């Protein structure tokens, strides 16, 4: 991701026709983040979700393992006056945060990329307070077979072309399909959250299930 950080947002705008910003704004809206709360935008990338949450008034930390991505986020936050956001480089599998310390965790397009999704979810659960909210935005697997086939073809052939044209790096986007095939997606992620004793897990399908949002409340 470091090699494509400078043009990461451009490629996302092109490949989704700008819709990724709409989906992230929906995450921000669903998060119900408010003044007096403490939140974490995990795998924050260039800061889209963090910027949106910062406007809600709570104290927010944006964490990512990739320094070039954090540098892009810092530049964007500086332009937008994101005083309520503190950025930190950290591993999602070993969060430098105390137990039960957060009201909210969001993770956009990051869970699928963790070295161990199960360990990542356990860490998120550890730092969330009882009653805390977890929102996950990521690629999904459409239930409709025809749509899924067309979607996979797009990810296999079209998306890497955008990556090559905009960043000179097709491989950074070609991996998405491979990672998605291994990702449990909508029902699989919900099942893992159920095992971690979240009392409420909602799945919101977007664009026929090509994307999805999970909203979970910790017991």
Residue ranges and their predicted role:
Residues 93-104:
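A short acidic, Gly/Pro-enriched loop at the edge of an enzyme's catalytic core
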């Amino acid at each position: 991701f470091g090699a494509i950080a400078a043009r990461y947002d451009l490629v996302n705008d092109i490949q989704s026709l700008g819709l990724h910003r709409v989906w992230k704004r929906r995450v921000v809206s669903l998060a119900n983040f408010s003044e007096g709360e403490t939140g974490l935008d995990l795998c924050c990338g260039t800061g889209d979700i963090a910027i949106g949450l910062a406007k809600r008034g709570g104290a927010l930390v944006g964490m990512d393992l990739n320094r070039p991505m954090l540098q892009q986020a810092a530049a964007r936050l500086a332009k937008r006056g994101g005083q309520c956001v503190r950025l930190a480089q950290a591993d999602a599998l070993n969060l430098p945060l105390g137990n039960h310390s957060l009201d909210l965790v969001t993770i956009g397009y990051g869970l699928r990329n963790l070295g161990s999704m199960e360990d990542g979810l356990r860490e998120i659960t550890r730092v969330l307070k009882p009653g805390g909210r977890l929102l996950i935005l990521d690629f999904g697997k459409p239930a409709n077979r025809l749509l899924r086939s067309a979607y996979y073809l797009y990810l296999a052939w079209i998306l890497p072309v955008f990556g090559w044209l905009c960043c000179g790096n097709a491989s950074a986007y070609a991996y998405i399909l491979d990672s998605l095939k291994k990702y449990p997606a909508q029902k699989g992620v919900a099942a893992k959250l159920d095992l971690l004793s979240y009392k409420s897990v909602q799945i919101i399908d977007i664009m026929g299930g090509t994307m999805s949002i999970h909203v979970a409340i910790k017991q």
